[in-house]
């Protein structure tokens, strides 16, 4: 888990230097999810989504974080948007189903 904390710290620094670094928000969100900090992960995915271009992986990550939090409606909306952007629905749905079973 220490590596995730280090990654978050490094991306904090990178995002202070370049607040429009979309990939930074995405990766920091992934690390936060791994540390079970799902609300903070959602906030990072929000940041990535609000910056152009539409970043499919941010919608997928946010959908998974919302699923862990029990926000099924939001998870479905993000899944739909990711699919519109070209993501594979079956793969996302499989991840969501696994999360739902673990809740």
Predicted segments, located by residue:
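Position-specific recognition of the canonical hydrophobic site in helix A of tetratricopeptide repeat
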Residues: 26, 30-33, 67
């Amino acid at each position: 888990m220490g590596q995730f904390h280090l990654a978050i710290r490094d991306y904090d620094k990178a995002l202070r230097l370049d607040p429009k670094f979309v990939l930074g928000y995405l990766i920091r969100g992934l690390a936060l999810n791994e540390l079970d900090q799902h609300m903070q992960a959602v906030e990072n995915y929000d940041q990535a989504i609000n910056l152009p271009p539409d970043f499919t992986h941010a919608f997928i990550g946010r959908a998974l974080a919302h699923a862990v939090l029990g926000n099924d409606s939001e998870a479905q909306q993000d899944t739909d948007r990711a699919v519109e952007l070209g993501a594979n629905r079956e793969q996302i749905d499989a991840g969501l189903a696994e999360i739902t079973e673990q809740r």
